[in-house]
Amino acid sequence: MKLILAIIRIAKMNETKIALSDVGLPSFTVMSVLGRGKGHGDLEKAPFVDPEHLELISEMPRLKSKRMITLVVADDKKDLAVETIIKTNQTSRSGDGKIIVIDTIHSIRVRTGEMGDITLD
């Protein structure tokens, strides 16, 4: 089993939700998160930024609102999940997101006590 964490743009959430469901991965959790990557974005194109303050603003660590999708999949569905998230979210611009894949030892369905891959359906 794999735990997949995907941090994506808010604007891509609905498209990602539909794409994951369309490939048979309808079960996931979504959280609102704040974060930043190494890039500062393209502040020079922002109409509200005073040129006098551009240098100061670009050096400040600003947090951006994103969505974090968490899903647990069987090992044989990891590539499908990752490829679907990439295909849906890749724009080749800074801020497209990040995907982290983590080995998972156990999954337990609380309602029934079932364990293992059967809990992923």
Feature-to-residue mapping (PLM):
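Positively charged, small/polar-rich N-terminal and surface patches that mediate targeting and assembly
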Residues: M1-D121
